[in-house]
Amino acid sequence: MGEKTLTSRVETSLKNQFGVTISNASKRQVYEAMMRSVRDILMEKKFSYEQTLKQSRQKRAYYMSMEFLVGRTLRNNLFNLGIEKEAKEFLSEYDFSLDEIYNMEPDPGLGNGGLGRLAACYLDALTSNEYPVTGFSILYEYGIFKQVITNGWQQEFPDQWLDLGKYGLVYRNDEEVEVRFGGELEQVMTDTGLKVNHKNYTSIQAEPYDLLISGYDSSAVNTLRLWEAKAKTGFNMKLFERGEYSKSSEAEAIASSISKLLYPADVTNEGKELRIKQQYFFISASLQQLVKNHYHEFGTLENFSEHVALHINDTHPAMGVAELMRLLVDEYGYDWDKAWSITTKTFAYTNHTIMAEALEKWPVSLFQPILPRVYSIIEEINKRFCAWVIEQGKEYTLRDTAIIYDDMIKMANLSIVGSHYVNGVSKLHSDILVRDTFKAFNDLYPGKFGNVTNGIAHRRWLGQANPELATYLEKLIGDDFIKDLSGISKLNAYKDDEKVLKDLQAIKLTKKEQLADFIKETLAISVNPHSIFDVQVKRLHEYKRQLLNALHIVYLYHEIKYNGLRPTPRTFIFAAKASSGYQMAKNIIKFIHSISQMIESDELVREYIKVVFIPDYKVTLAEIILPAADVSEQISQAGKEASGTGNMKLMLNGAVTLGTMDGANVEIYEAVGEDNIVIFGLETEEVEALYAKGYKPWEYYNNSPKIKTVLDFIRTMTVGGMNFNFIVDYLLTQDHYMCLADFDSYVKAQERIEKAYNDSSKWMKMSLANIANSGIFSADRSVEEYAKDIWHIKRVQG
């Protein structure tokens, strides 16, 4: 695809859409024309690839996820298509900056954190490796939310991303489907047996939009199908005329709410109901389309699992198990046993957490009225499963394994029972699943559980986010690593080359200067690019322990101000969103901002430490922050982080991990060796033993002078008229994730970080080792394992 083709497409789009030439077009017009032109290029490639797929009749995978945090698409597509240079030169002829055009595109509001970014990385890697795959999710009108910080407090506003973000989407009105909610069930005996009729339901229209997924140097173009909810009947004039104003637009209101926001707060029953509707909406629409298309092509569903692999990404799509059963039994007339055989051969499930609150459970009283037929199918699945467990002599496990227990529907259990394979996302996480969280299931289903360690789209997180480093590496070791990240290990040959180490240091400084400029421009805060950039950017949750980081900063403040400590200057950089209904997480954000304010108001302390919280964290911000990091804070309580992928992106860009032996940190430790990572804190078994013994945070306060100093000081803190006694009270009475138990070890680890950083040659050797040994964490490796070991799909070249 060359310059002439892109040029002519953009010029034609400008003429047809706006009646202008590029010479007199506005920046927005050029942006829209670029988005449309690239979309059209991908549509043509997609058509060609689809023809090849139809001829090959190869098995395809379908990745179902509540979120896909894809990030900006224009640069990614130009990079993957190999036409970024041509686009830049073409636009510069007319005094347009390609970077300015890039910056017009909003991050699509389709995800929130690591779960969604992983899904996006996998679509990228699967397409780059020419595997046929489709993603399914919801077209959220307002995304998760736009985070604004006011006086240190998080506020949530609608993220109106579609105004400028819609131009990459393809509306497919030819594939609309109906999704049903509520109503009653009627059982009717027919010649072929008992039939269930669903009556008096509310009908919602699912309208599909496709986001085309490009691959690097690949003939494949795959699709992320996004469903938007619309009222099927629309506004009811008769009800309105009778004065029933609310009822007249009830269907519109239900539909509108379904695709409004990702993860509505579920602290109320209304919020829980909406989450149930969202999950069923996109699952039902997706499966209806898939089953219909398969039946149209083959005239049977007997071979469905031979051609279709369905993947449940966390528990949100778990209803797919019951919905596929509904379609097979109710719509296509299969008997239960045959339908169950097809279903369980088709589904696989990835678990992403051992956190109890994230292993979704829905009250029967809430679920049944919303989805009466789906509930009755789940009830039957549970009945048959429990009978089978009793036959195995394992009835004592039903408390843990039953799908319905204590009037709660356990979605993780439904996913496990309805899938042929279940995997965790790091070696440690998968080990915890089989020996603890799902031990009873592992005993019932030997061989069903396995591991696929997460991976990242290295072409985005190195090639696009850090072109300075990528270009340097290409010249030094060749460009093989772009296609296959294992090739980056060639960099190990230069670990003692002082020139290379200094070159890498210079590149890191460039990225730090770029981030410093961004912080100055957006937050009006000046930071020293020669200071240590200590970075913790991830979803705000107590188990991720941003609070532990904050406690250490308070410790440094106290030591600088009162005890003569003069540390190497350090800039602590945070970015994180707290869930809208998660008050403790919001309190921690306020605490971090107050620490920053306290430091800024102290002339002595601010020479040595600075705290910056960058609001509204998203992919585009990550692409600016991660390449600039010196220190990668991965400090979750051991045993709580399933894997993490931010740790991998930071490693790839030369940051040194400061972390616990948790999630993929364990595998980073194995990859780089103990000299190139800084580990602290209790390990998983020690955490479990301490919980079992009875964790008493007061004992740590009484026995650690450092902890006592910090907590006593926080008691005296008043910033902007606010005190933080509640932080101290929480830590001394609850401290669910053992910040105090790990605090002294964390302080020592931070001292080791500073000592290593001050030895410039040693630090850059550590940095190089992290870059050079990151190959195992490519998403290419991860998706290869899914494709071969779980989905059993093959590459298809167009």
Positions of PLM-derived features:
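A conserved ligand/cofactor-binding region detector
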Residues: M1-G798
